[in-house]
Structure formats: C-alpha cells, structure tokens
UniProtKB/Swiss-Prot annotation:
<dbReference type="GO" id="GO:0042157">
    <property type="term" value="P:lipoprotein metabolic process"/>
</dbReference>
<dbReference type="GO" id="GO:0034447">
    <property type="term" value="P:very-low-density lipoprotein particle clearance"/>
</dbReference>
<comment type="similarity">
    <text>Belongs to the apolipoprotein C1 family.</text>
</comment>
<dbReference type="GO" id="GO:0050995">
    <property type="term" value="P:negative regulation of lipid catabolic process"/>
</dbReference>
<protein>
    <recommendedName>
        <fullName>Apolipoprotein C-I</fullName>
    </recommendedName>
</protein>
<dbReference type="GO" id="GO:0034364">
    <property type="term" value="C:high-density lipoprotein particle"/>
</dbReference>
<keyword id="KW-0445">Lipid transport</keyword>
<keyword id="KW-0732">Signal</keyword>
<feature type="signal peptide">
    <location>
        <begin position="1"/>
        <end position="26"/>
    </location>
</feature>
<dbReference type="InterPro" id="IPR043081">
    <property type="entry name" value="ApoC-1_sf"/>
</dbReference>
<dbReference type="GO" id="GO:0004859">
    <property type="term" value="F:phospholipase inhibitor activity"/>
</dbReference>
<keyword id="KW-0964">Secreted</keyword>
<keyword id="KW-0850">VLDL</keyword>
<dbReference type="GO" id="GO:0006641">
    <property type="term" value="P:triglyceride metabolic process"/>
</dbReference>
<dbReference type="GO" id="GO:0034361">
    <property type="term" value="C:very-low-density lipoprotein particle"/>
</dbReference>
<dbReference type="Pfam" id="PF04691">
    <property type="entry name" value="ApoC-I"/>
</dbReference>
<dbReference type="GO" id="GO:0006869">
    <property type="term" value="P:lipid transport"/>
</dbReference>
Length: 88
C-alpha cells in the first residue's frame, strides 16, 4: 500500500524538480544566497528556541505530567498486587 501511494508522490516531486524554478523564483546570484544563509539559520534557531520554550512552559503549566505519573503508579500497583496474589 505504501509503495502504491509513494510512487505518485515521487513522480510529482521529480516533475517539480525537473521543471526548474519559476521565473519569479529564479535567484539572481548564488553569492547573495550564500550571504543570507547565516541570517536565515539564526532566524530559524531563534524561532525554534521560542517554540520549544513555549511548548515546555505549556507542558509545565498543564496537569498532564501529574496525571501520567498517577496513572503509571496505579498501573504499577495493580500489576504488583496481581503478582502477589498469583505467587502467594
């Protein structure tokens, strides 16, 4: 099933790559592109850092960790009780 779905996607991607850039997308000079790479990487890093911090803060503020910890504790205690009754 995956092969059937991946082949059309591969054909579309190859056709897009072989078609080349549109006239509006064509870069004038490669050197200007290389000069912008550090700025783009810094911007990407800052954006990634902000999103990661926001996600961590959201997790800290939510009650999901406490609920997960309680669920694991309860499940562990149930398994422990079953083992005690089975081997006693």
């Amino acid at each position: 099933m995956r092969l059937i779905l991946s082949l059309p996607v591969l054909v579309v991607v190859l056709s897009m790559v072989l078609e080349g850039p549109a006239p509006a997308q064509a870069a004038g000079e490669i050197s200007s592109t290389f000069e912008r790479i550090p700025d783009k990487l810094k911007e990407f890093g800052n954006t990634l850092e902000d999103k990661a911090r926001a996600a961590i803060e959201s997790i800290k503020k939510s009650d999901i960790p406490a609920k997960t910890r309680n669920w694991f504790s309860e499940a562990f205690n149930k398994v422990k009780e079953h083992l005690k009754t089975a081997f006693s």
